[in-house]
């Protein structure tokens, strides 16, 4: 699937159920691996990234059986992981590498973690510093992977994140489960996704959550999970964006996770005038879930400020496209974190959208988009640069443009959503 051609669509119509949430699936496999007994996971979001987590915890001594989107994890116990004698390969999964490092800080032995070329460019000093303060020995390669960690007797800390990052927060909180008496506290400059806190609480760990701060207390054991994973909001977002932009669209998405730390994209779309309704609200696996209905409408420009960024960081590429078809100029501020994702997403977004006719100007911490409320010209070839979010952005751009778009490196969607293109075609009306 190295190249995919996406033809313009008249509208999107249909009902969809997107795969289980990747972030929550990672956590279910990882925490199930150190729980007592057997954890059962249904509607798991199986992709290249989450399969890396399965392979990693197997290498460390847990047992995992996977069949379709169902999985059983037989945990090794809270301190039962063992160094396999060779590096643990995290593939492209930054969530896995950072969260696993927090868990390994509480294990006996010396562990080495490696990743692919993309993951090896992403910063790791941001987890090495707090874990070192807690008593673990963490060595990076000039601030990147490969990484080695040697667990030790951990002491609780109060740590203020220099940058809002759910992965760093989760790493520190997971290490806090292994610390000596007293809470480990993480203070955030802006709210980030709280899946780790919710799952730990459901497994019997004492957790305190309040605005801008999360704390965990040490535990002797983790209770096994029995969880149905909500649909991945970030996988739903491309369909939401396209349906918002294509006149005549009527789209329903069932069983989507609507955790408020993840749905900033909906908040921003509503501010722009979008018609997105959430109904049948419920709770699954300790997470809020709902069904979404989306219809097309005219949109107006808006500004996304730094405090909002963590709640839609994965959707900001899509926001750039939506903003390009709105009335007026839209701005994203305080999104420097985009530069250290699977690609430099600020530059990648510009390189995809500008040749298609979207007027976008980049800055160090974001971008400005000059909206024109009509279809961009499209056409040509764009490079997904090995980044699944950029491939999905290019696909949506192809749907809403006047001319077809060719996407090179389209196979990168397999990192999070292997069936993305098939699902997209199933609802496109031409």
What residue spans do the PLM features occupy?
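Structural preference for solvent-exposed beta-strand-turn elements
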Residues: 1-430
């Amino acid at each position: 699937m190295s190249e995919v051609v996406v033809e313009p669509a008249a509208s999107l119509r249909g009902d969809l159920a997107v795969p289980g949430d990747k972030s929550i699936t990672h956590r279910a496999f990882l925490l199930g691996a150190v729980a007592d007994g057997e954890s059962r996971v249904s509607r798991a979001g199986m992709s290249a990234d989450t399969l890396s987590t399965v392979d990693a915890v197997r290498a460390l001594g847990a047992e995992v059986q996977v069949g379709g989107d169902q999985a059983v994890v037989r945990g090794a116990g809270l301190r039962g992981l063992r160094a396999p004698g060779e590096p643990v390969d995290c593939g492209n999964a930054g969530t896995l590498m950072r969260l696993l490092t927090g868990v390994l800080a509480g294990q006996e032995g010396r562990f080495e973690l490696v990743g692919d070329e993309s993951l090896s460019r992403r910063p790791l000093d941001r987890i090495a510093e707090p874990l070192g303060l807690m008593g673990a020995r963490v060595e990076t390669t000039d601030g990147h992977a490969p990484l080695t960690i040697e667990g030790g007797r951990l002491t609780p800390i109060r740590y203020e994140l220099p940058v809002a990052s759910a992965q760093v927060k989760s790493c520190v909180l997971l290490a806090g489960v292994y610390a000596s008496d007293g809470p480990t506290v993480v203070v955030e400059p802006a709210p980030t996704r709280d899946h780790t806190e919710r799952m730990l609480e459901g497994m019997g760990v004492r957790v305190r959550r309040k605005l801008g701060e999360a704390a965990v207390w040490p535990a002797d054991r983790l209770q096994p999970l029995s969880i149905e994973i909500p649909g991945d909001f970030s996988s739903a977002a491309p369909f939401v964006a396209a349906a918002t932009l294509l006149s005549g669209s009527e789209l329903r998405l069932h069983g989507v996770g609507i955790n408020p730390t993840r749905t900033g994209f909906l908040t921003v779309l509503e501010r722009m005038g979008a018609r997105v309704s959430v109904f049948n609200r419920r709770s699954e696996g300790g997470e809020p879930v709902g069904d979404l209905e989306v219809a097309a409408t005219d949109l107006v420009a808006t500004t996304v400020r730094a405090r909002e960024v963590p709640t839609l960081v994965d959707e900001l590429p899509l926001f750039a496209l939506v903003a390009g078809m709105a009335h007026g100029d839209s701005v994203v501020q305080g999104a420097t974190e985009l530069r250290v994702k699977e690609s430099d997403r600020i530059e990648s977004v510009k390189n995809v959208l500008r040749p298609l006719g979207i007027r976008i100007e980049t800055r160090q911490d974001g971008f400005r988009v000059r909206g024109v409320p009509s279809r961009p010209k499209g056409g040509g070839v764009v490079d997904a640069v090995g980044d699944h979010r950029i491939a999905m952005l290019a696909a949506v751009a192809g749907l809403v443009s006047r001319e077809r778009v060719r996407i090179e490196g389209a196979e990168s969607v397999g990192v999070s959503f292997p069936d993305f293109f098939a699902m997209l075609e199933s609802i496109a009306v031409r």
